[in-house]
UniProtKB/Swiss-Prot annotation:
Disulfide bonds join C35-C123, C94-C114, C131-C156. It comes from Homo sapiens (Human). The keyword Signal applies. Serves to link two monomer units of either IgM or IgA. In the case of IgM, the J chain-joined dimer is a nucleating unit for the IgM pentamer, and in the case of IgA it induces dimers and/or larger polymers. It also helps to bind these immunoglobulins to secretory component. The modification Pyrrolidone carboxylic acid is found at Q23. Glycans are attached at N71. This is Immunoglobulin J chain. It comes from the Eukaryota. The gene is JCHAIN. GO terms for biological process: adaptive immune response; antibacterial humoral response; glomerular filtration; humoral immune response; immune response; innate immune response; positive regulation of respiratory burst; protein-containing complex assembly. Pfam families: Ig_J_chain. Part of the secretory IgA (sIgA) complex that consists of two, four or five IgA monomers, and two additional non-Ig polypeptides, namely the JCHAIN and the secretory component (the proteolytic product of PIGR). Part of the secretory IgM (sIgM) complex that consists of five IgM monomers, and two additional non-Ig polypeptides, namely the JCHAIN and the secretory component (the proteolytic product of PIGR). JCHAIN-containing IgM interacts (via CH4 domain) with FCRM (via Ig-like domain). Keywords: Disulfide bond, Glycoprotein, Pyrrolidone carboxylic acid, Secreted, Signal. One of its GO terms (cellular component) is pentameric IgM immunoglobulin complex.
């Protein structure tokens, strides 16, 4: 009897896991900003009030990196206590895209708030694709030298 109950319990957990995974797969990733530790997904669901109507559901996940420094490249800088997230800045896509319009190919961006000055954004964690360095003291043979070291070696030293 115990084996029978255990089998049905394991089967129920497996079916629930498959159902949750299927729901995650139908989400569309709108933003995955590793620099700001933010991810925004979207999916279309049926309205519980009107079955003929669909609703767009947004899921905004922000991971606040505690114990991070104001300047992530400087381990002596003070701890960051203020995190600012602007949804419009997270969602803007300023990369130019080629679009065909009236049999002509036009270069356009998907956002109308692109500005060259706003290109430098504050990162709350390391962007693994960007090279970060810091100057650290190195003691070798009784001599102390200040050397530059890579904080993200994979991005700083190509294969």
């Amino acid at each position: 009897m115990k084996n029978h109950l255990l089998f049905w319990g394991v089967l129920a957990v497996f079916i629930k896991a498959v159902h949750v995974k299927a729901q995650e797969d139908e989400r569309i990733v709108l933003v995955d900003n590793k620099c700001k530790c933010a991810r925004i997904t979207s999916r279309i669901i049926r309205s519980s009030e009107d079955p003929n109507e669909d609703i767009v559901e947004r899921n905004i996940r922000i991971i606040v990196p505690l114990n991070n420094r104001e300047n992530i490249s400087d381990p002596t800088s003070p701890l960051r206590t203020r995190f600012v997230y602007h949804l419009s800045d997270l969602c803007k896509k300023c990369d130019p895209t080629e679009v065909e319009l009236d049999n002509q190919i036009v270069t356009a961006t998907q956002s109308n708030i692109c500005d060259e000055d706003s290109a430098t954004e504050t990162c709350y964690t390391y962007d693994r694709n960007k090279c970060y360095t810091a100057v650290v003291p190195l003691v070798y043979g009784g001599e102390t030298k200040m050397v530059e070291t890579a904080l993200t070696p994979d991005a700083c030293y190509p294969d």
